[in-house]
Design a protein with these regions (language model features):
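Inter-helical turn/loop segments and adjacent helix faces that build the functional surface
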Residues: 286-294, 426-433, 485-489, 553-563
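Glycine-rich, acidic and aromatic/proline-enriched surface loops and short helix-turn segments
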Residues: 241-248, 441-449
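Replace the tail clause
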Residues: 4-429, 461, 570-678
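Extended, hydrophobic alpha-helical segments in both membrane/secreted and soluble proteins
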Residues: 58-65, 251, 255, 279, ...
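Long, polar/charge-rich, low-hydrophobicity segments
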Residues: 308-311, 448-476, 481-637
Length: 678
């Protein structure tokens, strides 16, 4: 008897998600669920049918998102119930952070916790009234089943509509509070920055690294603040703990998203572009400050990982690698001692495999489900085997023959900007031409392929299609990245592009009444509320990045309006930053820059020549968080910092200005270094 195809003998056509660009949404295109993407069509369908909306939010590298899909969304009975009683909507949180942030805040307020997959129930106007995260197919560990939750919602929707309306109204009012935060009518207070930094240092885990208890996320912005403020001890502990832990891919480079435990051993294995861009930059700054070559190595291995495994043909970077392969979390990255020996057969001298096994703490019984997450138990004190580099290359080749984790190959504007900035800084500091070339290619991709016909940024790109209006973080990160690229290359087109982007950001997102910036543009589709992106976790908020970028522009141009807009952000949040320094660490970095006596360095070459390399390397080679840099031939008028400056006796000259006064120009790198180090 022939086997019947699924769904009662009929071959099911893909659902509405088949036309989307998000790899996460495309993963659900063959579900029997009648999914809608977020948009007016879905909301109108809910109003027409008087059904509640079942909103499911996730992302492609999310392990539990995949689990819930297998258990519930691929189940025909569950799907039939969803289709009959709800209007189901699927959202990729990375493409639509505006939607995700609203409903994540709502669920956290209702349940006290959040995460992905996010499951929320909304009225036809999009107002949430109930929600949670992952729900199992059967009752488990005190959790109701997904079917039980849906049935309870349907019952309440049918018989207790007045209660639902009251709950929705209350939640909507609470959600709007973030956008209504008023700026404190006071001057910025330097002592608050000192207090916040002191608090951050006091909560650092000086034994295991990081802050707080498990799970631990890489705290890049917090470490940047501590480095800028000269508190290097907690930075060193954390950088070592992560670099030698299981959260770092000891064979292929790059960091996983977070550690499940408090010792950085067991990661959640997905690799995100944004984490690795931020951490490459932090390890670069750690090397520049502390001089440890191991930090330079981690920085470079992380960037090489991004260039090797995450770069698209047009110069942009993919978003993430999944945690799972072959249906198991972390399988691609795990090892047994026997596999290590097999990979190293014929490599190096006799006994190298035993040395590598010992160095990486691999045991017969394993440390994760019978296999081993490679780490370095001895940390910085452990002497690596003499042939470790050859061994790692052989193990990488061996591992590459395994089934790879899935790749989310959409290119997000903001995350690409983070990687462009990291490559630009590293390329200038190390120095490395390959990194600079990659940074330029990445910036050209953004400027060419992620803007519309009016010059406005677009959020996402895949398969030669860019779409969705960009958000505040996209504009703010692009400003920071292009300024970093200008300082690394002195190519004035990147300064011009940064300024153009900043001006457009102010026009589209600024809150002229209360200060700061909204997450969405003034002409964005109307959602339940219009929020402000404020927290720097796990990535810098749009407001923090906007403030920092505008301050750097103000220093390069002398344009006070940029500084005024940045101060508006600080006035919103300076009191909160004292109480929650880790959550607002990038904001505090911006405040540190504001309160510091910033040194403005202008390098001038003879007209038609260059010759700035030696002077520029003095500035670029060190970690200088309170310096801005401009350079170009005599007669250049952009940035304004270069205007009316000339060479000295025909030789390239460096001008250092601070507190509205400039020192005499110098021509020798040693003299410039002495001036910067005063």
């Amino acid at each position: 008897m022939p086997l019947l195809p699924p769904y009662g003998g009929l071959t099911r056509m893909p659902n509405r998600l088949a036309g989307e660009t998000s790899p996460y949404l495309l993963q659900h295109k063959d579900n029997p669920v009648d999914w809608y993407a977020w948009g007016p069509e879905a909301l109108e369908r809910a109003r027409e049918t008087d059904r509640p909306i079942l909103l499911s939010i996730g992302y492609s590298a999310c392990h539990w998102c995949h689990v819930m899909e297998r258990e519930s969304f691929e189940d025909s009975e569950t799907a039939a119930y969803m289709n009959e009683h709800f209007v189901p909507i699927k959202v990729d949180r990375e493409e639509r952070p505006d939607v995700d942030s609203i409903y994540m805040e709502a669920v956290q307020g209702m349940t006290g916790h959040g995460g992905w997959p996010l499951t929320a129930f909304l009225d036809p106007d999009g107002v949430p009234f109930y929600g949670g995260t992952y729900f199992p197919p059967d009752p488990r560990h005190g959790m109701p089943s997904f079917r039980m939750v849906m049935e309870a919602v349907v019952q309440s929707w049918t018989t207790k509509r007045d209660r639902i309306r009251a709950s929705a109204d209350r939640i909507k009012h609470q959600l709007g509070a973030v956008g209504r935060i008023e700026a404190v009518d006071e001057e910025l207070i330097p002592d608050l920055l000192d207090q916040a930094t002191s608090t951050l240092g006091s909560i650092a885990d000086m034994e295991r690294g990081g802050f707080g208890s498990a799970p631990k996320f890489p705290p890049a912005s917090a470490l940047e603040l501590l480095l800028a403020r000269g508190m290097t001890d907690p930075v060193e502990v954390t950088l070592d703990a992560m670099a030698f832990g299981g959260i770092y891919d000891q064979i292929g480079g790059g960091f996983a998203r977070y550690s499940v435990d408090d010792v950085w051993l067991v990661p959640h294995f997905e690799k995100m572009l944004y984490d690795n861009a931020l951490l490459a930059r932090t390890y670069l700054h750690g090397w520049q400050t502390l001089g440890h070559e191991r930090y330079r190595r981690v920085c470079e291995e992380t960037l090489v990982w991004a260039l090797r495994e995450m770069r698209g043909p047009e110069g942009g970077f993919h978003s993430a690698l999944d945690a799972d392969s072959e249906g198991e979390e972390g399988r691609f990255y795990l090892w047994t001692p026997a596999q290590i020996r097999e990979a190293l057969e014929g490599v190096g001298s006799p006994g190298v495999a035993d040395d590598v096994i010992a160095y990486y703490g691999a045991k017969e019984e394993g440390n994760f489900e019978g296999r081993n997450i490679l780490h370095v138990p001895g940390g910085a004190e452990a002497a690596p085997p003499a042939e470790l580099d050859d061994a790692r290359r052989a193990m990488y080749t061996y591992r590459s023959r395994r089934v790879w984790p899935g790749k989310d190959d959409k290119r997000l504007c903001s995350w690409n900007a983070l990687m462009v900035g990291a490559l630009a800084e590293a390329g200038a500091a190390l120095p490395c031409r390959d990194y600079l070339d990659a940074a330029v290619a990445g910036a050209e991709f953004i400027w060419r392929d992620l803007r519309d016909e009016n010059g406005r940024l677009l959020r996402t790109y895949k398969d030669s299609r860019a779409h969705l209006a960009a958000y505040l973080e996209d504009y703010a990160y692009v400003v920071e990245a292009l300024l970093a690229l200008y300082e690394a290359t002195f190519d004035v087109r990147w300064f011009d592009a940064a300024r153009e982007t900043a001006d457009l950001m102010i026009e589209l997102f600024a809150d002229d009444e209360r200060g700061g910036f909204f997450t969405t543009a003034h002409d964005h589709e109307e959602l339940v509320v219009r929020r402000k992106d404020l927290d720097d976790h796990p990535i810098p908020s749009g407001n923090s990045a906007a403030a920092f970028g505008l301050l750097r522009l103000a220093a390069l141009t002398g344009e006070h309006e940029y500084e005024r807009r940045a101060v508006g952000v600080f006035r919103l949040l300076q009191r909160a930053a004292v109480r929650h320094p880790q959550a607002l660490a990038h904001l505090l970095c911006g405040m540190d820059f504001y309160f510091a006596s910033v040194k403005e360095v202008a390098l001038v070459a003879p007209a038609g020549g260059d010759g700035l390399g030696d002077l520029a390397s003095v500035v670029r080679s060190g970690f200088r968080p309170h310096v801005v840099l401009a350079g170009g031939p005599e007669g250049t008028d952009r940035p304004e910092l270069l205007r009316d400056r000339g060479t000295v006796d025909g030789e390239p000259a460096a001008y250092v200005c601070q507190n509205f006064a400039c020192q005499r120009p110098v021509t020798e790198p040693e003299a410039l270094a002495a001036s910067l180090n005063q």
